Amino acid sequence: MGMVSKRKKMHYGDTHLQRRWRVRNRRRDLDQIDDDLQTRSGELINQNVDLDKPGFAQFYCVHCAKYFIDDTAMQAHFRTKVHKRRLKALEIEPYSIEEAERAAGRGSFVKPKKRAMETQPSKEDVVAGKRIRVEVVPEDTDATDSPSTSKTKRKKVEKMET
């Protein structure tokens, strides 16, 4: 006779994975950050002193929605891949209610606009009047208007020979 087998604890050591998905660790979504960029970016950079936040809420990255302890930490953050990836993600216009309705069949598809995004100016520049620039990048309309298939090229060549 063998011994009775004990129940195995499959997810016993996964507490570090569970912590990652807790609500207190949630970051702001891209559409919320885009709304902050459009409406109140200067206000977020020049916040009042708050003793509960890191760096007394004086060093805030608007694109990543994150506080830093001092200016050197924030400038080092601007050079990291995390910040650069967030800038690239913010270049595309965020998902909207209109886009959801078009996806449900209540309209025609409109390609999301691509924008030029820059890192936020320093605090002194904001006091001087500089703001975060978000510009829509114009796309090439030549490629979408005329199809470049081999049949259309052949037809043009045939017309030239006759």
Curated annotation (Swiss-Prot):
Zinc-finger ranges (C2H2-type): 59-83
Stretches with biased composition (Basic and acidic residues): 115-136
UniProt-listed SMART domains: ZnF_U1
UniProt keyword terms in alphabetical order: Cytoplasm, Metal-binding, Nucleus, Ribosome biogenesis, Zinc, Zinc-finger
Subcellular location: Nucleus; Cytoplasm
Keyword field contains Metal-binding: yes
GO CC terms of this entry: cytoplasm; nucleus
Biased amino acid composition, Basic residues: 151-162
Lineage: superkingdom: Eukaryota
Parts forming coiled coils: none
Assembly information from the UniProt record: Associates with pre-60S ribosomal particles; released from the pre-60S particle very early in the cytoplasm.
Name by which UniProt lists this protein: Zinc finger protein 593 homolog
Upper taxonomic lineage: Eukaryota, Metazoa, Ecdysozoa, Arthropoda, Hexapoda
